[in-house]
Amino acid sequence: MDKYVAISIMCRDENEYLHEWIDYHSAIGVDHFYIFDNDSQTPISETLKQQVENGLVTVENIYGVGDTMRQQRSQSEAVKKLTEYTWVGLLDTDEFVVLLDDSTNIKDYLKQYEIYGAVGLNWLLFGANGHEHKQESIINSFTQSCPSNGANKHIKSFVRTKSFINTDHDPHFMSTIHGTVNVDLGVIKGPFNNPPILDRKMRINHYVTRSMEDYNQKRLRGPGDGNGEKKITKYSDNFFKAYNNEDVQNYDIIKLKERIDNEN
């Protein structure tokens, strides 16, 4: 098995989204997935039993409500455990990496950044597409993007393991020996890349609300890092409205999937 790029996530009770998320990222060339299961009611190791057995997925169980640094500590732990990989992406289950140029393999993109410590990809936020209820496919069902939303300045990073120092300050930004750049090689010194780069090389589709039903469950569940009531309050009606006030249809990820299917 190739060991060039892995992705790590932390989640709780988001099992239903994992198959599509893993299948998609496997199709674009991700070699391994390291998942922190934060006390899910149905263990993720059961949901992904086949993927765990064939070595595609590693699940580590963690328990209980954490503090504000829980996600950062888990990210650091994942990178340190995955040093046989050149790159580790630190994402969430509602984030999908989109390749915007000709290649359908993420390895072709990451090889361009091997002298740097990390590459930061901007979010492009997506809303609910008017869906009240859960949909079978996130990728095919949610095409309502929000390109003008100020939160698109946020990045998520792929970090080169040999350059990694820590994620002590922010889950959106890694401290590295060789620094972080955006996809155009501009220097990034914090959790934002502004103006965001949304139309070339790589970005992250962030399906922040999914449907109204998904969103209401998210409000009850709280964040995947288990920070409890303190952070559940951020998922308000106004939060939902903020990510559903634009309707710019974006099909980039669907077109990428079609290119992959045509190659196979």
Per-region residue spans from a language model:
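N-proximal low-complexity "stem/linker" segments adjacent to membrane-targeting elements
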Residues: 1-23
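Short acidic/polar active-site loop segments enriched in Thr and Asp
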Residues: 31, 86, 117
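Short acidic donor-binding/metal-coordinating loop in glycosyltransferase active sites
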Residues: 38, 92-96
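Short beta-strand/loop segment that forms part of the nucleotide-sugar
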Residues: 31-39, 60-64
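Ser/Thr-glycine-rich phosphate-binding loops at phosphate-binding pockets of nucleotides
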Residues: 9, 36-45
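Active-site-proximal specificity loops/subdomain of glycosyltransferases
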Residues: 43-90, 98-99
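Short, acidic, metal-binding catalytic loop of nucleotide-sugar glycosyltransferases
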Residues: 23-32
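Catalytic-site signature of metal-activated, phosphate-bearing donor transferases
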Residues: 72-73, 99-264
